Amino acid sequence: MLKVYNTLTRKEEEFKPLNENEVKMYVCGPTVYDHTHLGHGRTYVSFDIIRRYLEHIGYTVNLVINFTDIDDKIIKRSQEKGKNPKELSETFVNVFLNDMATLKVKPADIYPKVTEHIPEIIAFIEKLIEKGFAYKTENGVYFEVKKFENYGKLSNINLEDLISGARIEPSDEKKNPEDFALWKTAKPGEPKWESPFGEGRPGWHIECSAMSSKYLGEQFDIHGGGRDLSFPHHENEIAQSVAYSGKDWVNYWLHTGFVMVNGEKMSKSLGNFITIEDISKEYDPEILRFFFIQRHYRSPIDYTAESMSHVKNNLEKIYNVIENIRISLEKSEKSGIWNENEFLLYDILKNSKHNFYEAMNSDFNTVEALKSVFEVSNGVNKYLSLVKTPSEGLLLKAFDFFKIVGEIFGLFENYFKESSESNDEGFVKFLIELRSDLRLQKNYEMSDKIRDGLKELGYQIEDNPKEGTVFKKINI
């Protein structure tokens, strides 16, 4: 049973999507005015792993990642560079997509851009005005926060504390200091669109509400982003969207932790701002992915030269194990009597696979899941050092375990990109043959152990007098 930590309720909850076999997920994309940095990489690799795991356990995932391609920051940067805002944003859209490809992040199903959804945003704002949650001024349109009863629930912020001065935009035309902009009246020289509220452009928060509703509906399963977005961005999204539809909007809110550099927050002013483009020249993308999963996605992670060296060494060790398996398969045998070494590795493989899924089912806990990966690595190394002729079935099973890990974590691509079929079935047939031999020897205790072990791996076997022993895949 999959459980996820919901920022909204501050606890782990059983994951139940609105549609049984489909997950609708929206992850806030970048404001495209600069290069993709390490913090972005951590967020999108984390949600890539979450998406991969959901797909691995049988869900169809509909993922939307937006581009904020018009914003105060884009306008300011375009003026500094002497470029058109559209030209600037398109440049960094391409930078982002290239960086995600470098990091082996699977593409989203849809990448909507704000500038291509102005009519939907205007319609969204009109309905909020109609329902009494928003009001027009000469400067644009504002959402009246006091009209929304549960404001602050996601970020655990008290409205009175907010009014006293925390991260709000001042304006003489606001009814209340905490109200936020849905539409901004155009200033001279800025990009603008016609609207019932006058020429202008959307505010930041309304974009995601309008675009997510268009592609995922008025209710969906997962909304994600960096922890820094929980307030004010995600808090304001909730207020707008629930006010708009009158329905609960998102069931599960997931947020990634911050990336530190040598114990300090990453920033240009400190000179420790690291772009994906630059770091990819120094480290293989798989090393970066492996670095990110060393910490739980909700926890902060500290980038240091020492930590990267440690990560690189550990990843190389796993690659060496996979290579040793490949080489050892050439001298392995398909059948034979198992001794203590075979049964020990079999138990390690069975237990580690179980523990891996247990960890991933506990809010995608990659830290605990990695322990299982190292247990298998150590177990395989020890086994190969003790036997002259290894069991083909066991080696195939170990190989398949690393293939599963690679598919979920986006690793080991060099070994598995040409092999798309699992070795499970061959291993199951091998164990069934071994079990039959044990039953002939009246070693029922060990044959029952194999039967029970196969069930834990997701296979049910039946002894048929006419057809012999047959097996079928079951859900575990």
Curated annotation (Swiss-Prot):
It is an enzyme of class 6 (ligase). InterPro entries: Cys-tRNA-ligase (IPR015803), Cys-tRNA-synt_Ia_DALR (IPR015273), Cys-tRNA/MSH_ligase (IPR024909), Rossmann-like_a/b/a_fold (IPR014729), tRNA-synt_1_cat_dom (IPR032678), tRNAsynth_Ia_anticodon-bd (IPR009080). It is found in: Cytoplasm. The keyword Ligase applies. Its main location: cytoplasm. One of its GO terms (cellular component) is cytoplasm. Keywords: Aminoacyl-tRNA synthetase, ATP-binding, Cytoplasm, Ligase, Metal-binding, Nucleotide-binding, Protein biosynthesis, Zinc. It catalyses: tRNA(Cys) + L-cysteine + ATP = L-cysteinyl-tRNA(Cys) + AMP + diphosphate. It comes from the Archaea. Belongs to the class-I aminoacyl-tRNA synthetase family. PANTHER family: CYSTEINE--TRNA LIGASE, CYTOPLASMIC (PTHR10890:SF3), CYSTEINYL-TRNA SYNTHETASE (PTHR10890). This is Cysteine--tRNA ligase.
